[in-house]
Amino acid sequence: MKLLCLVAVVGCLLVPPAQANKSSEDIRCKCICPPYRNISGHIYNQNVSQKDCNCLHVVEPMPVPGHDVEAYCLLCECRYEERSTTTIKVIIVIYLSVVGALLLYMAFLMLVDPLIRKPDAYTEQLHNEEENEDARTMATAAASIGGPRANTVLERVEGAQQRWKLQVQEQRKTVFDRHKMLS
């Protein structure tokens, strides 16, 4: 994280200061003119001041004769656009730095993961014993509830829950054993 902050600060210091003469990419007047009579639609970009951002100053050469210029210009939509490419570049560098750091962290975790998840034989044996005890208690509970006195709705629901829990426990044990045999 400190490296990322350092890269961002150095990037901001190395970027040249904003100039009064911005390039045509940073400041522009964009006019979108739709089709008019036999003339197809067109987009015009021009580096002009904000007060001159209209069809008469931006659309060059004028595609219509003199008497249709006013009607053509009324159809055109002109917008003044200003952006800072320096800011955009800095944001992209920061974004790529964060993504790169996350990718490095992911690669580190993938390398370290086998060492962290190394199974301990003693812990695995205790886990198996706990599962066997749980399965035995579930089986005895299911046998006692599943008897002839399960007359009420509540007792039937509890019996169904116990049977379901027993089935889930058996399935877990089977899946765990299969997984153990495969690896």
Swiss-Prot record:
Expressed in heart, lung, kidney, liver and intestines. Enriched in the hepatocytes around the central vein. GO terms for biological process: endosomal lumen acidification; lysosomal lumen acidification; positive regulation of canonical Wnt signaling pathway; protein transport; proton-transporting V-type ATPase complex assembly; regulation of protein catabolic process. The keyword Transmembrane helix applies. The modification Phosphoserine is found at S144. Its main location: membrane. Transmembrane protein that binds to and facilitates the assembly of lysosomal proton-transporting V-type ATPase (v-ATPase), resulting in enhanced lysosomal acidification and trafficking. By bringing the v-ATPase accessory protein ATP6AP2 and the v-ATPase subunit ATP6V0D1 together, allows v-ATPase complex formation and activation. TMEM9-controlled vesicular acidification induces hyperactivation of Wnt/beta-catenin signaling, involved in development, tissue homeostasis and tissue regeneration, through lysosomal degradation of adenomatous polyposis coli/APC. Pfam families: Tmemb_9. The chain crosses the membrane at residues 90-110. InterPro entries: TMEM9/TMEM9B. The lineage of its organism: Eukaryota, Metazoa, Chordata, Craniata, Vertebrata. The transmembrane domain (TMD) is essential for the interaction with ATP6AP2. Residues 21-89 are extracellular. Disulfide bonds: none annotated. The gene is Tmem9. Residues 1-20 form the signal peptide. It comes from the Eukaryota. It is a single-pass type I membrane protein. Interacts with the v-ATPase accessory protein ATP6AP2 and with the v-ATPase complex subunit ATP6V0D1; these interactions lead to the assembly of the v-ATPase complex. It comes from Mus musculus. Belongs to the TMEM9 family. GO terms for cellular component: intercellular bridge; late endosome; lysosomal membrane; lysosome; mitotic spindle; multivesicular body membrane. Keywords: Endosome, Glycoprotein, Lysosome, Membrane, Phosphoprotein, Protein transport, Signal, Transmembrane, Transmembrane helix, Transport. Disruption phenotype: Knockout mice are viable and exhibit no discernible phenotypes in the overall liver architecture and hepatocytes. However, they display impaired hepatic regeneration with reduced Wnt signaling. Knockout mice also show a suppression of intestinal tumorigenesis. This is Proton-transporting V-type ATPase complex assembly regulator TMEM9. N-glycosylated. It is found in: Lysosome membrane; Late endosome membrane; Endosome, Multivesicular body membrane. Glycans are attached at N21, N38, N47. Residues 111-183 are cytoplasmic.
